[in-house]
Amino acid sequence: MNQQQSALLNNLTIIKPNFHAFTAKFHSKLAQSSIEMNSPTALQFNEKSFTLFCVLERIVKHLDKPASVAPFLAHHLMYLKKSGASHSDIALLSNAFYETLEEHLGKHFTTESQLAWKKALRYFESFASNVLFNVTNVVSLQQRMQQKQSNKI
């Protein structure tokens, strides 16, 4: 387990006893945002809070093994697809989640854990964009060479 995973798991341990309050705050932030997807009601969100915690914990525990996280995360991303999530919704979800962490953890949201969550959420955004919308931030070598050629003309 690397330092990033350790920081994330420590934060999850702090949040776990009061995860229903965390998910209620997260739902509230999503409701206030300009998210386009059909989000669940507060009651439905609360009912799914244990599942959300288990999914988060499993992903964090295996972050150092992307090959084992990818299929699991892809499976759970289908919920977002069924909910009509747009590409911009992915960033809104990440931002709301990060803000909720910041408020809920308070002084326990150290610089180390902030960086770890930012990195994990960037991974989530990139992976979700690729799986749900076939958008990637990786440019193939051939594409890059063609771009350079067209710039020379």
List where the protein language model places each region.
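Core of compact, soluble alpha-helical bundle domains
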Residues: M1-I153
